[in-house]
Amino acid sequence: MMRSHYCGVLNRTHVGEQVTLSGWVHRVRNLGRFIFMQIRDREGIVQVFFDEKDEALFKQASALRAEACVQIKGEVIARDTSQINKEMATGEIEVLVKELVVYNNSEVLPLDFNQNNTEEQRLKYRYLDLRRPEMAERLKTRAKITSFVRRYMDDNGFLDIETPMLTKATPEGARDYLVPSRVHKGKFYALPQSPQLFKQLLMMSGFDRYYQIAKCFRDEDLRADRQPEFTQIDVETTFMTAPEVRAMMEKMIRGLWLDRLNVDLGEFPQMTFAEAMRRYGSDKPDLRNPLELVDVADILKDVEFKVFSGPANDPEGRVAVIRVPNGAEITRKQIDEYTQFVGNYGAKGLAWAKVNDVNAGLEGLQSPIAKFLTDDVVKALLARVNAQNGDIIFFGADSEKVVTDAMGALRLKVGRDLGLTDLTAWKPLWVVDFPMFEKDDEGNWSAMHHPFTAPKDLSPEELVQNPKGAVANAYDMVINGYEVGGGSVRIFDPKMQQTVFGILGINEEEQKEKFGFLLDALKFGTPPHAGLAFGLDRLTMLITGTENIRDVIAFPKTTAAACLMTDAPSFGNPKALAELAIQTTVEKES
């Protein structure tokens, strides 16, 4: 027998037992008469010790380095009260070693387990980084999340059905990863950005409730919460309304938080996209932060200060403020830093006013823009934001997009900087009623979610007449400022689907080429269907309390979409490329 117990499960109930443990040497202390070691495995750490009375065993133990892989056999002993380590789950006991087997000693480590290593080091030696208890715990949590999801789905009649990994390139927003075909030279498969069309086809096939823990691929610029390959909890249903889908998925997430964190999230509030953008400057608002954007264009439209009155009178403009309680303590240096910060979002500056005496109107303000304001304007402004003595008010005035983006980002930053954001809280919500379409950089319509999302209460003819005003029957689940899931009711009428494609600039020939199979399927008794997908990586990131998605993926890529451990991607073998009829335009570096 190579193991009788996991290291991390031993406790006082095992005192007197003979145990066999296998794992890694976590830490060594040689005190002369005794050698104390911490032995670690997947489930935790336990202290073992060697007595110098057994000379051969003591000598063998003396040669061990950290991260040596060993087996020990010994007796579980209760520690003296003074020696109990309350920081360790196994801190009430230790193991007197009687036999030692060294499976493999370790060379000097390229990582220091007790120090902060660079992310580059951690990714290059990922197999060592994953031995760290906090990393092991995160991946164990991930496994328990997927186990919970599978149980919930099974209990609610969902079928786990796999969809193809080699599929057809379709416009879903990001670039595809292409896979060349050897048999069909010059042609390429695409790795799926999501199982979207296949899960819709499964609903058309009558499977009613589908789910899949699905690997997805997107060739896009990466951020801290993005990876080129990621995992979705993918869900689709027939004959369920959007509120019914949301209720079922909300119940799952509430159950998951209760299971993993013993936290009751309560019933999720619901907010429209328009309200979220107006009040928080984001379609994924972090409700732990009490600060809000307040529109004041109507108050400032007649002031002589063109920086305010210009956008206030522009139909495409916006003037909004953020009141920061007790923000008068913010220094001029901090204000300058915030001014530079909002510049990253296109803002040309950041006006501000400190409220020294709310009852004194204009005279009670300390602000470089006070000279441009009247007493009546100031009083109306202070009343609108419910200002108090000691507050600071930040102003944003520009195009609607610039103000919304800049002030939304400033809200988050100030909330963090001043400790206003309650980092211990959980604040979930549903964001609903998204615009159906948005303009891209070239002024053309693009789908805000994807081209298969149904509009709310519109005929194809009405949609064509007013695409700008169309509201999608779409919904996102947001927790603490992270979009953890999103979905919609799908189009199940072929005419509506063709209409949406047309608005997006996809002509009939292109529709037939790229989506002919879908348009054909829609003709044969397609049922109403809806669904959504959760980001498993992002859910795990939230539940484990890390802010880097790479911490919850076993073998992640860098922000340059590279694997430092395996050196992927790499140049293709010339013979293999020739078989695929591929010639590269980039020369391999010598």
Curated annotation (Swiss-Prot):
One MF annotation (Gene Ontology) recorded for this entry: nucleic acid binding
Subunit: Homodimer.
Gene giving rise to this polypeptide: aspS
Positions with a binding annotation for ATP: 218-220, 227, 483, 535-538
Compartments, as annotated in UniProt: Cytoplasm
Species in which this protein is naturally found: Glaesserella parasuis serovar 5 (strain SH0165)
One GO cellular component term: cytoplasm
Catalysis: reaction(s): tRNA(Asp) + L-aspartate + ATP = L-aspartyl-tRNA(Asp) + AMP + diphosphate
Protein name: Aspartate--tRNA ligase
Phylogenetic placement of the source organism: Bacteria, Pseudomonadati, Pseudomonadota, Gammaproteobacteria, Pasteurellales
Residues passing through the membrane, by range: none
PANTHER family, per database record: ASPARTATE--TRNA LIGASE, MITOCHONDRIAL (PTHR22594:SF5), ASPARTYL/LYSYL-TRNA SYNTHETASE (PTHR22594)
Pfam families: GAD, tRNA-synt_2, tRNA_anti-codon
